[in-house]
Amino acid sequence: MIIDEFLARYLIKLRTGKFDVQMKLSRLLFSMLFSAVLFGCTDTGIKTNRKIQRIHNDLFTVDAHSASAINFLYKKNFDPARLNDFGSFDYPRMEQGGLDACFFAIFPGKNIKGESNIDITFKRIEKTVDAIANSIADNPDIVEAALHPDDGYRIVKEGRKAIYMGVESGFAINSVEMVKEYFDMGIRYMTLCLNINSLLCDSSTDPKGAEHNGVSQLGMDVIEEMNRLGMMVDVSNVSDKSFNDILEHSKAPVIVSHSACRALCSNHRNISDEMLLRLKGNGGVVNITLLSQLLKSPGIDNNSVQQKLSDLKEKYKDLIKADPARYGDEYNIERERIVKESGQNASVADLVDHIEHVIQVIGIDYVGISSDFDGGGGVDGCKDVTEIENITRELILRGYSRSEIKKIWGGNFMRVFREVAKVAERN
């Protein structure tokens, strides 16, 4: 039954020309042979699940972008060391799902320019970092803070989980000197903008359009400092012109911490095939994320769904500003309900479609995975961190080898992280 479902899925893709036929036929043959061994072991499927679990547990799995850091600061009852009945992440669920390393992308809050807001943003990030650090200090047998790419592998070998930190949005910074302050806090990547233009660069989604015609001079200086220190430059959310400027200026490979492929889902936040080719030339990595709106374009009921989502955003806009913890969760739950009822929610299969598209365009060495859990991330088959093994299962079903899955699940991301550190060492 499982093999029939797998074959049907692939025959559809081959007929529609969605993927390269020769490459897919070879993978299909491998998958049929692999599946025959894997699924022929037992009628109950117990051995099948054990084999997949063994492969999954053998990986070094990295979530390149988790928004769950917001819970450390805003959720009063959040204890990451215990199993919580809200959110998508905690340490017990991290263990259950087999996630080895997580990059907490610290969301700085309201995107408003100005000196006072930068000060507020800095303090908010500082408080979040302190909250995460305190949690790690309270649970040394479970987790450890990681700063260097090699730290993660060491920590996991010792039987614990590795916690890295990044900052989402260039609104966290208004001077080159601040880069060092964030680096000293333990921040190892920074996204240069979010949904509107920052002081550093233009966003892909600012309704006012471009402000800097790409990257500003301050943005260029910040990139140089990030390269010097060994902080990864995250080009998620940036405009196409900003993307090109960053790749031209950066001496180190860059990351796309959470995005997907524009060829499969038309969204300004996704990256085009041309951008993928430039990313390959830079040696960077794109991490395909579990955000339905980036993985799957709305269908026939597009206008109706989009109107409902637009109305919802307007309803919660001021409420979230006043109480991001309470109303942010309410908004995400309501948004997920609208998407689910519309039949537009993406699945693990959609996620892997985007991974395969990257592989087809630029090869298997430039793609990774991120969740954006507690920031809107979560698809059918992978709603929280306990279900990430389903991604491994889907990759196995599609014929990817253990070594290939290792690259996708963290190897490629850590390669870039290591190269960024080497560039800093040479400076």
Task: Report residues per predicted region.
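Short Gly/Ser/Thr- and charged-rich N-terminal loops/segments
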Residues: 15-21
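Sec-dependent signal peptide recognition
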Residues: 24-31
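Bacterial N-terminal signal peptides
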Residues: 31-37
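N-terminal hydrophobic targeting/anchoring segments and the immediately downstream early-domain regions
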Residues: 41-213, 266-427
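Histidine-centered catalytic micro-motifs
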Residues: 61-68, 238, 256-260
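Distinct, well-ordered alpha-helical segments
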Residues: 175-179, 239-252
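Alpha-helix-loop-beta-strand connector modules within alpha/beta enzyme cores
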Residues: 214-226, 246-253
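Substrate-binding cleft of carbohydrate-active enzyme catalytic domains
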Residues: 221-235, 241-242, 275-281
